[in-house]
Amino acid sequence: PEKFPLKPVKITGNRQIAPDVYVLSYQRDFTFVPGQVVALAIDQSENPRMYSIASGMHDEEIWLLYNLKPGGSLTPRLSKLKPGDVVYVSGPGGNFYGTAKPSVWIASGTGIAPFVSMWRSGLNKDKMLIHGGRFLHSFYFEDQFTDKLAGNYIRCCTREPGEGIYHGRLTQWLKERENLPKNRKY
């Protein structure tokens, strides 16, 4: 908490984008590098949780993607918040930065957030996105990737088959690729 001092902000939105998945937004008053995180709490006395920024660095709002965890200490309360309610957030931190270089992005579930930020910030040339999810509705923001990335947007779904979707785990899709370097960590 000392590394990430918290300040109050009024939320501007808290929309559900899939079952148990939300995007909380508030006015941006800082600059950040795509891939960074902020700390978030509902009350200053509680330990904050870290969330990757999903908005682009030129967007007027900060977007935080989160998954409702029934029985959790924060997300059940977060999911009930309305525009105008106050949360406590830090400035940006972390060093998982995007790059303009050709890259393979690998994410599952809400782990897509930093790549959404990179994409919306213009770091979207020569990218491949491998996105894992349990259900077809788990590919958050897929509309932003489908047309532009075309064959470089790979969706791996473990529980539901679908057209153009690899039915299985993301890790299995990676193992089946012969053209990926085997000595790298994915």
What are these regions (language model features)?
Residues 73-186:
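FNR/FR-type flavoprotein reductase catalytic core
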Residues 1-83, 159:
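Ferredoxin-reductase
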